[in-house]
Regions:
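Acidic/histidine-rich alpha-helical segments that form the ligand environment
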Residues: 99-131, 138-141
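Short glycine/proline- and charge-enriched loop/turn segments
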Residues: 24, 95-99
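Bacterial Sec-dependent N-terminal signal peptides
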Residues: 1-22
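Short N-terminal segments immediately surrounding and downstream of signal-peptide cleavage
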Residues: 19-35
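Short, contiguous alpha-helical
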Residues: 31-34, 40, 44-47, 52-96, ...
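An acidic intrinsically disordered interaction segment
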Residues: 33-40, 110-116
Length: 171
């Protein structure tokens, strides 16, 4: 009987550790793409200190930093609304619109709102139940990958314009 109880306790502890580690991994991914130093430069670091003029700068056919940040904000805001069960604004489904709606005058607001939305997703994950996490883990992991991808693009654009400080993490 003691062995059975011992095995049940181990199984229970193992299941709890797996559930909490999924939350921990998702939070680590979200925070490393948002504002924590990890394997790569975070989004907050990638956009910090950039003027609205530099945010609107484009080289050839590439997107500007502002367009990339606006695109990230657009999709993260929709994910957060989904997670919270909120109604989303209508959207045509044309991904190009998520880049094209950036306006240089709104740069500082985009940066602030992006920080708030990313924090909102992190808070949602922190407070989510196991069932909520299970249902949304793939979406959250993909958001992190999406944000990391576009953060890399932001750094490439900043390097091209000469506004990137290599001391921030990428030479």
């Amino acid at each position: 009987m003691k062995r059975i109880l011992f095995l049940l306790a181990i199984i229970s502890i193992s299941a709890t550790a797996q559930k909490s580690s999924m939350k921990a991994v998702l939070l680590e991914q979200l925070k490393s793409t948002h504002n924590a130093s990890n394997w790569f430069v975070s989004l907050n670091v990638a956009v910090e200190g950039l003027s609205s003029e530099k945010a609107a700068w484009k080289d050839g056919g590439n997107h500007s930093v502002g367009q990339l940040a606006y695109h990230i904000l657009f999709w993260n805001e929709r994910v957060l609304q989904d997670l919270k069960g909120e109604k989303k604004a209508s959207f045509s489904g044309k991904n190009d619109e998520t880049f094209e709606n950036f306006d240089q005058a709104q740069w500082n607001d985009v940066v602030k709102k992006l920080d708030l939305v990313l924090t909102g997703i992190e808070n949602w994950v922190e407070n989510a139940t196991d069932d909520q996490l299970k249902k949304n883990a793939s979406t959250i992991a993909n958001v992190s990958a999406h944000n990391a991808y576009h953060t890399g693009q932001i750094i490439v654009v900043r390097k091209a314009q000469g506004s990137w400080d290599p001391e921030k993490g990428v030479k």
